[in-house]
A protein has these predicted regions:
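Positively charged n-region of N-terminal signal peptides that target proteins for export
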Residues: 1-4
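Short S/T/G/P-rich N-terminal loop/turn motif that feeds into the first structured element of a domain
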Residues: 20-239
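Bacterial N-terminal signal peptides
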Residues: 7-17
């Protein structure tokens, strides 16, 4: 993940990844590389919190992160200061091992004063994903196991067609692992700017041909739990 192309949101990893081969939608989509650990927090000052982490990378170094970043919820927040810190790893093994190396609830007084931990969770990418954080639309979706592989296939198709149509977009589908009652499938549509995200929406409302693929994909979704825009960035890269 040095040149990270993850190809970076509940129970055991084996039980959650296996549905991709089930159902009557033949052919498994190759899962993406690596894994992510996300720490969901409520920050009194998100910008100050992010700067503090940039200036003090020791926690990232301690857990062996390959890359780390922050996402701040910009629209549809559940609470003021909603954001999360993510850490990218080369494998699920490394991601799981990181949980033994750092306890976010035992942080320094300086960190504890600026943010309140909500929960943490691991994610496995279910398709290739180019990690280029910026303007990100995040949907939390409930999708039955029998439809998950078909949904991922549609996202692979949609991403390809949208890029052919001139959009600089990365689409990711992520399986939560160990997220308790909080998490569902994460669908991310990432653009280099909010203006580009808006251009995609203009084309969608204008009847772009690729909207038929989107319609087929959303027909496989049981429930849209939430829909937000986030501003994401890389704040640490291992040397």
């Amino acid at each position: 993940m040095k040149n990270i192309v993850v190809g970076v949101l509940v129970g055991l990893a084996f039980g959650l990844s296996s549905p991709l081969v089930f159902g009557d939608h033949h052919g498994q989509v190759p899962a993406g590389d690596g894994a992510f650990v996300a720490l969901m927090v409520k920050a009194s000052d998100p910008d100050a919190y992010i700067q503090l982490l940039k200036d003090n990378p020791a926690p990232f170094e301690a857990i062996g992160s390959t890359v780390a970043g922050a996402c701040v919820t910009k629209t549809g927040a559940d609470y003021p200061g909603q954001m999360f810190i993510w850490n990218g790893f080369d494998s699920m093994e490394q991601a799981m091992a990181a949980t033994d190396k750092y306890d976010a609830n035992k942080a320094t007084a300086e960190l504890s004063a600026i943010r309140e931990v909500q929960y943490n969770v691991m994610f496995k990418p279910l398709k290739a994903f180019d990690l280029a954080p910026n303007s990100e639309r995040l949907w939390r979706l409930k999708i039955s196991p029998s439809n998950l592989n078909a949904f991922v296939k549609k996202m692979v198709q949609l991403e390809s067609v949208m890029r052919e149509d001139g959009h600089n977009v990365n689409i990711g589908v992520f399986q939560p692992i160990g997220g308790g009652i909080h998490e569902t499938i994460h669908l991310r549509a990432v653009s280099p700017t909010y203006a580009e995200s808006g251009k995609i929406l203009d084309d969608a409302f204008g009847g772009a041909e690729w909207m038929s693929i989107w319609a087929e994909a959303t027909a496989l979704v049981d429930e849209v739990v939430s829909d937000n825009f986030e501003q994401c960035q890389v704040i640490y890269t291992a040397e």
